[in-house]
């Protein structure tokens, strides 16, 4: 699903912004670009945020966090038909881009605000980024997390020196409680995305990408609340006005997509891209996205899983669901990006090891490298040995065997055996089934 192309900063244009190679004049005229550099009037909302704020943030952040690499991917380029460049934000100390905005916000605090301390609500990357840099700057930090936040995330946040308060069954309840505490204690509320300093900090990603790979003409950026794409859009348009910018959301949480389309969203129960599972986009971020972003794509859970596995196998890098969203959109809509110079942000790498293990196994099934085959055979001594010998002849490696008699619907002298096999590809699976059937067994594939 896509949004219609939108104009940039009220400037008129003859063609959509997606024609990134069409030059700057098609995006912004000189007057509009000058406005973009000083302050932004987006729709009916005056946003006290501009390209210069991102530049100031870059100066403030320099030397205080990792300037992550932005590298060309030869293999992903061959797969997608685009020239693909990856920004490894999962290499930050807390494995997420969220550090940028959090640190920029902390550095902008007054002496009085630093002494009072900061508070945020988060179950993940925003919490750890804020807690880590608050500790470095000796700023008291309080983080409110939902009660059912995984213990590992709670402990990691505490290890960074923050006071952690567990409250509520979801993020919205935790956020409401955090705001109450902020008012009661006089703490500085740090919004995870709808804050000028947060947005400007996240925008430094685009500055680094275009400095490292100036040929990039297209950006695909994950969207949760919109802080990263809003900041990157301001930065990228300030440097390269004709650049094409696309957002991507999880299909189960299409909040920004639906807000801009004027339709009521339907949310899923969960998504593996929990880092972008936001039900309400920011007011500031929404205004910026509406004016500066070409389209928003939606990707499903299978798209995200496939991209996580591809990045692990090809780039040898671990990303969370949100970090794989950009590649998922590129793979799903590869015809839209043929021949483009595409920059993707691997925005985070905090994924539960057990979830990653499940995703890898499911990916192997989809690619035909792991198969479950049921074989019907006579329940006689030596029958199982004949099946395994047949499997060995076709180079199938047995991973698991389940021999079931009592719960089978077959006659009493027959049995079903389930084999989980390591295979090469789908063609190899078909070869195995054909070999078993030719040997007199009845074999079928479990889908």
Model-flagged regions — what are they?
Residues 8, 27-28, 36:
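Cysteine-centered motifs
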Residues 13-16, 39:
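Cationic, low-complexity basic patches in intrinsically disordered or flexible, solvent-exposed regions
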Residues 17-20, 24, 43:
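Composition-driven detection of intrinsically disordered, low-complexity segments
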Residues 41-447:
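PLP-dependent amino-acid enzyme catalytic core
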